[in-house]
Amino acid sequence: FWVENKDVDGHSHFLICIFSIVCDNVQAEQEIDQHLLVIRDAIYFYLRQKTFEAILDAKQAETMKKDLVYTINNYLTRYKAKDILFESYIGQ
């Protein structure tokens, strides 16, 4: 993901992140693949509405992870994501 965010002064910055969704079975992965476009869109808009400072605040990392899992699970009907793991998370 590349997400543009504004800081408190209104300056544009970019969040560049790569993550994996943790599932408990293959069928969950298949359901995620079926809904990938809307899931990606929802994640993008979740991250986009945050300020740049909030995104980089380590104290909010666990809350953001839980929020993202909740967001993903809103689009899944049969199976659920268990966690999200950030492989890369860079703010510029």
Residue ranges: model-predicted function:
Residues 1-46, 55-58, 62-66, 70, ...:
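N-terminal, polar/charged subdomain of small-to-medium soluble alpha/beta proteins
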